[in-house]
C-alpha cells in the first residue's frame, strides 16, 4: 500500500480543512499519516477512527524559537524515515521548510502547500527580514528537488515566492483555497 504523509503545524487546521482530502486519498488506497502538533485528544481519536496514523511533534506555529524548530526538525526526520512515505505533503511554512528540506535530501516527492506566505514575507522588521533571507535560501535548496511541487491558493503568493526564490513555474500550481 502506498503511503501519503501530511505534515502540518496544527491538528485543528488539518481537521477543519484537510480531513476530506485525506479520506479521499485513503479511499483511493493510500495509508494516511499525519505529522502535527496534536493538542486536542478528540481530533487525534477522530483521525485514529478514520484509520489515519498520527504522529505528534513539538512544533509551535507562532514561535521563532530556533531550539524548538530544530527539535521539531530532528523529530520529523525520524518520523519520516520510519514512515518512508511515497509522497510527503507539507502544509504551512514551518512544515514546508522542514519537510521540503528532508524531501530534497532523500530525493522524495513532496508537495509544499502555502495557504499564505505569512509574516516572514510581509513584515518589515529587521529580524523578520533576516529570517526571510534564510527562508528564501532554504526554498532555493528545496526547489532544486525536481520532485517538488509548490502549491498556492493565490496567484499573488505564487508570483512573489517564485520571483524571490527562482522557482520554475512548472513546479507550481494555484488551486482554490482549502477553506
What are these regions (language model features)?
Residues 58-87, 97-101, 105, 133-141:
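An amphipathic, basic-hydrophobic alpha-helix
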Residues 6-67, 157, 172:
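N-terminal strand-loop element at the rim of the active site
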Residues 90-96, 114:
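Short His-centered aromatic/hydrophobic patch
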Residues 55, 136-179:
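Donor nucleotide-sugar binding/catalytic pocket of nucleotide-sugar-dependent glycosyltransferases
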Residues 9-14, 60-64, 108-129, 142:
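A short, histidine- and acid-enriched strand-loop-helix "catalytic/donor-clamping" loop
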Residues 3-5, 103-121, 151, 173:
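Active-site proximal beta-strand in glycosyltransferases
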Residues 23-28, 74-77, 130-150:
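Membrane-proximal helix-turn-helix segments that form the acceptor-binding/catalytic region
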Amino acid at each position: 500500500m502506498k503511503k501519503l504523509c501530511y505534515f502540518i503545524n496544527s491538528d485543528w487546521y488539518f481537521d477543519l480543512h484537510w480531513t476530506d482530502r485525506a479520506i479521499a486519498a485513503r479511499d483511493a488506497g493510500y495509508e494516511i499519516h499525519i505529522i502535527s502538533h496534536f493538542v486536542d485528544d478528540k481530533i487525534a481519536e477522530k483521525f485514529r477512527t478514520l484509520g489515519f496514523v498520527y504522529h505528534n511533534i513539538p512544533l509551535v506555529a507562532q514561535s521563532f524559537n530556533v531550539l524548538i524548530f530544530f527539535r521539531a526538525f530532528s523529530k520529523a526526520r525520524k518520523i519520516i524515515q520510519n514512515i518512508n512515505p511515497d509522497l510527503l505533503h507539507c502544509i504551512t511554512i514551518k512544515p514546508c521548510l522542514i519537510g521540503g528540506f528532508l524531501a530534497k535530501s532523500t530525493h522524495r516527492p513532496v508537495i509544499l502547500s502555502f495557504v499564505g506566505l505569512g509574516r516572514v514575507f510581509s513584515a518589515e522588521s529587521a529580524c523578520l527580514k533576516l529570517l526571510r533571507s534564510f527562508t528564501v535560501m532554504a526554498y532555493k535548496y528545496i526547489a532544486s528537488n525536481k520532485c517538488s511541487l509548490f502549491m498556492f491558493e493565490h496567484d499573488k503568493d505564487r508570483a512573489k515566492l517564485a520571483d524571490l526564490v527562482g522557482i520554475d513555474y512548472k513546479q507550481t500550481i494555484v488551486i482554490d483555497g482549502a477553506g
